[in-house]
Structure formats: structure tokens, C-alpha cells
UniProtKB/Swiss-Prot annotation:
It comes from Ralstonia nicotianae (strain ATCC BAA-1114 / GMI1000). Belongs to the transferase hexapeptide repeat family. It holds the Pfam family Hexapep_2. The keyword Transferase applies. Keywords: Acyltransferase, Amino-acid biosynthesis, Cytoplasm, Diaminopimelate biosynthesis, Lysine biosynthesis, Repeat, Transferase. It catalyses: (S)-2,3,4,5-tetrahydrodipicolinate + succinyl-CoA + H2O = (S)-2-succinylamino-6-oxoheptanedioate + CoA. CDD domains: LbH_THP_succinylT. Homotrimer. It is found in: Cytoplasm. One of its GO terms (biological process) is lysine biosynthetic process via diaminopimelate. The lineage of its organism: Bacteria, Pseudomonadati, Pseudomonadota, Betaproteobacteria, Burkholderiales. Substrate binds at residues 106, 143. GO terms for cellular component: cytoplasm. The keyword Repeat applies. The gene is dapD. This is 2,3,4,5-tetrahydropyridine-2,6-dicarboxylate N-succinyltransferase.
Length: 275
């Protein structure tokens, strides 16, 4: 089934210039709707870790993009306090108390998650934003004013602190999603974009900005990483001098590996999770 679905999406992608809300074959509409539905349930992901490597399902990302070609804007309401006009409905638009109980997560007003995003059990959405295609795994806290961009992959027991920005893939168009692996702590107002991978058990300090061109300097080894924070790293903002010493440029610095002291400062509060 998934192979047939993928084939339909790939064909529709090649013909995307000819697609619109008023001009699209029924099988294409059904295929795109199927993908969005599976993303919403967590049955399908834009990226998966297999044999220790992250594999991006580009065709799934294409289905997300195609959904914008196929849908018209429509009025939407939010709890009676305001109105919206958009192509993608809220994930929770038709949720009942039973649906929330089955989901096993908390959603604090006025948090927004778009349909096609997945929220795992014991996750907590403070007033935040989760975009279409994103995957937020079990036990993760998305704190106030944090943003989880389109198709971003957030692991288990992650803490995204207040105002954190996790970049998406839709605009500007990115090849790969941002991935935050299990048990990571992302400090307040930090930004992770352009498909950067933060590997498991890492701690990112406040105000760290990570993109593909950001130098990630390991002060113990002198090694410079791009696009990847090694597992168990503690990262803070810093600067590196130019070759001629006339100026310095921003970088991120790996100051040490996570230890017991770091964990004590960044541990999750189980009282905030669960039923």
C-alpha cells in the first residue's frame, strides 16, 4: 500500500504545476489526504532512524507540500474567541474528551497544532505552535512560545524551552527536517534550523543559534562540526577569531559532555506529565 501511495505522490509532484483546489484527480486528493491522516496519527513520519541513521522520506514531505496546492482557504474558529482563514485545520478541531484521553497529552490554551502533526503520550504543549508534518514524541515539553516547524522531528523526553525555534522545511524550502533526538534540552530562545541534527542526551544553552553553516567547535578536541551536535554535548554560544585576527564570528561551542551536574539542572519534572 505504501509503495503505491508513494508512487502516486511522486507522480503528482511532477505534475504539481497543474494541480489546484479545482483541478486535481480524485486519486491524488485521496493519496495526499491519506498521507496527512497517517502523519496525524504518527503511523507515517517524514524522517525515521534506521540502523543508527536518519532516513528522510522525501515523498512524505512532498505530500505535505502538495496538500497546500489542493486545499482552498476556509474560515476556522478557535474556541469562540477568534477566527482564522487558512488551508490547514487545527489538529484538535473535532477532538472530543475521549480523543484527548486516548491521545494522553496535554494542550494548554492557546497552543496550536496543525492537522498532520503528531503529539505523543505524556507530551505537554504550553502556549506554543506545532506545524504540519512535525512529530513530537512521548514525554516532551514544548514550552511557552516555542515553535516546532513543519516536518521537524522531536524525540522522547525533550524539553523545548520558552521561545525556542525549531525550523521547518516548507519556506525556505529545505531538503531535510530538523531533528532533536531523545532526552535533549534546548535552552530558551535558541534556534535550530536548516536540517541540523541534535543528537541524543545533548543540552543546548540559552541563545544558541544552529544552522548548516554554523561552526560547532569542540573546545576539548579542536574539532569543528557542521549540521550536527554530537550525542551528549553541552553547547553554549561563543565566537571564533578570523585567520588574521581582525574580527570574530559567531559559533557554538561544545564546552563538555553531559554529566550528573548538567542533568540535575535540566531534569524533567514528572509531576507535569501523565494523567
Amino acid at each position: 500500500m505504501s509503495q503505491q501511495l508513494q508512487s502516486l505522490i511522486e507522480q503528482a509532484w511532477e505534475d504539481r504545476a497543474n494541480l489546484s483546489p479545482k483541478a486535481a484527480p480524485n486519486d491524488v486528493r485521496a493519496a495526499v489526504a491519506n498521507v496527512i491522516d497517517q502523519l496525524d496519527q504518527g503511523a507515517l513520519r517524514v524522517a525515521e532512524k534506521k540502523d543508527g541513521q536518519w532516513i528522510v522520506n522525501q515523498w512524505v514531505k512532498k505530500a505535505v507540500l502538495l496538500s497546500f496546492r489542493l486545499e482552498d482557504n476556509a474560515p476556522m474558529t478557535a474556541g469562540g474567541f477568534t477566527h482564522f482563514y487558512d488551508k490547514v485545520p487545527s489538529k484538535f478541531a473535532s477532538y472530543t474528551a475521549d480523543d484527548f484521553a486516548r491521545g494522553g497529552f496535554r494542550v494548554v490554551p492557546p497552543a496550536v497544532a496543525r492537522r498532520g502533526s503528531f503529539i505523543g503520550k505524556n507530551a505537554v504543549l504550553m502556549p506554543s505552535y506545532v506545524n504540519i508534518g512535525a512529530y513530537v514524541d512521548e514525554g516532551t515539553m514544548v514550552d511557552t512560545w516555542a515553535t516546532v516547524g513543519s516536518c521537524a522531528q522531536i524525540g522522547k523526553n525533550v524539553h523545548l524551552s520558552g521561545g525556542v525555534g525549531i525550523g521547518g522545511v516548507l519556506e525556505p524550502l529545505q531538503a531535510n527536517p530538523v531533528i532533536i533526538e531523545d532526552n535533549c534540552f534546548i535552552g530558551a530562545r535558541s534556534e535550530v534550523v536548516e536540517g541540523v541534527i541534535v543528537e541524543e542526551n545533548s543540552v543546548i544553552s540559552m541563545g544558541v543559534y544552529l544552522g548548516q553553516s554554523t561552526k560547532i567547535y569542540d573546545r576539548e578536541t579542536g574539532e569543528v562540526h557542521y549540521g550536527r551536535v554530537p550525542a551528549g554535548s553541552v553547547v553554549v554560544p561563543g565566537n571564533l577569531p578570523s585567520k588574521d585576527g581582525t574580527y570574530s564570528l559567531y559559533c557554538a561551542v561544545i564546552v563538555k559532555k553531559v554529566d550528573a551536574q548538567t542533568r540535575a539542572k535540566t531534569s524533567l519534572n514528572e509531576l507535569l506529565r501523565g494523567d
